[in-house]
Every structure is written in C-alpha cells, then in structure tokens.
Swiss-Prot record:
Reaction(s) this enzyme catalyzes, per UniProt: (2S)-2-hydroxy-3-oxobutyl phosphate + 5-amino-6-(D-ribitylamino)uracil = 6,7-dimethyl-8-(1-D-ribityl)lumazine + phosphate + 2 H2O + H(+)
Role, per record: Catalyzes the formation of 6,7-dimethyl-8-ribityllumazine by condensation of 5-amino-6-(D-ribitylamino)uracil with 3,4-dihydroxy-2-butanone 4-phosphate. This is the penultimate step in the biosynthesis of riboflavin.
Entries under Gene3D superfamilies matching the protein: Lumazine/riboflavin synthase (3.40.50.960)
Active-site residue list: 88 (proton donor)
PANTHER family: 6,7-DIMETHYL-8-RIBITYLLUMAZINE SYNTHASE, 6,7-DIMETHYL-8-RIBITYLLUMAZINE SYNTHASE DMRL SYNTHASE LUMAZINE SYNTHASE
Natural source organism: Clostridium perfringens (strain 13 / Type A)
GO terms under biological process: riboflavin biosynthetic process
Cellular component terms (Gene Ontology): cytosol; riboflavin synthase complex
One GO MF term: 6,7-dimethyl-8-ribityllumazine synthase activity
Ribosomal protein is among the record's keywords: no
EC number(s) recorded for this UniProt protein: 2.5.1.78
This protein's name: 6,7-dimethyl-8-ribityllumazine synthase
Phylogenetic placement of the source organism: Bacteria, Bacillati, Bacillota, Clostridia, Eubacteriales
C-alpha cells in the first residue's frame, strides 16, 4: 500500500491570502497567524501576496482569480462572520463555504477555508489567537500540506 501525504515544507512555494476587511481587527490577527505559519515553514515573505476584499462574501471571486493565475501553490481565505439579529449570517456563511469549495474543486489548487464563523464576538476573538488557537495559522498549515500532497500525486 502506498500512503500519500503532504509535508509542511513551504520553501520555494508561493501562496496568496484573500482577506475580508469586515471585522478587520479580528481578521488582522488571522493574517498574522497565517504569516507566522508560512514563515515558520520556509515560505519567504516575498512569496506571499495579500488581497483585501470588502467582506467574506467577496472572497471566493478573488480566490478564484488568484488560483486560476497559476502563480500560487495555494490560496488561504480569511475572514470573520459573526451572527447578528437577522438571517444574513446564514446566507453569507453558506455561500462563502460553497464558493471556496467550488474554487478549489474547479481549479485543482488548494483554496483553504479560514473563515471564522461564530455566534458572538468573544468566540471570534478566541479563534484569532487566544484560547482556541489561531485559525489563520491553521489555514496556512493546511495550504502548505495540501500543496505538497498535490505535488506527490
């Protein structure tokens, strides 16, 4: 039996980050986590591009454009969606999730879901580098691993 796995060596790879500006004070912490993960695993700063979009809903379009460019081993999508008093949260979360998954499947480039979806702001803060780790860091790690796995197939 042959086991296929990706490693966490990011050297000589280029990655893109797409970040939603809405709730920027949280998203900036996710970006910091992603940059930390990339740096720790050999990705040079000049091999990371960051694209800002207005909010989470706009992320899939730019992720698709970046993935189709052929320049990147992976694209990390970062944003925060916090439940409010209306059903807006449900629509945004559902469409962003589907959009990101479709981009990855359509382009065969790892497009990683790093969108923090929470019931309240406290939960979002916890997932941006406090009690619950940093989901940006986790997303960057997944991008490196998936990029290497695809190379091994």
């Amino acid at each position: 039996m042959r086991i296929l796995e990706g490693n966490l060596i990011g050297q000589d790879k280029k990655f893109a980050i797409v970040a939603g500006r809405f709730n920027e004070f949280i998203v900036s912490k996710l970006i910091g986590g992603a940059l930390d993960a990339f740096k720790r695993h050999g990705v040079e700063e000049e091999n990371i591009d960051l694209a800002w979009v207005p909010g989470a809903f706009e992320i899939p379009l730019i992720a698709k454009k970046l993935a189709k460019s052929g320049k990147y081993a992976g694209v990390v999508c970062l944003g925060t969606v916090i439940r409010g008093a209306t059903s807006h949260y449900d629509y945004v979360c559902g469409e962003v999730s589907k959009g990101i998954a479709n981009v990855s499947l359509d382009t065969e480039v790892p497009v990683i879901f790093g969108i923090v979806t929470t019931e309240n702001i406290e939960q979002a803060i916890e997932r941006a580098g406090t009690k619950a780790g940093n989901k940006g860091f986790d997303a960057a790690m997944a991008a490196i691993e998936m990029a290497n796995l695809l190379e091994n197939i």
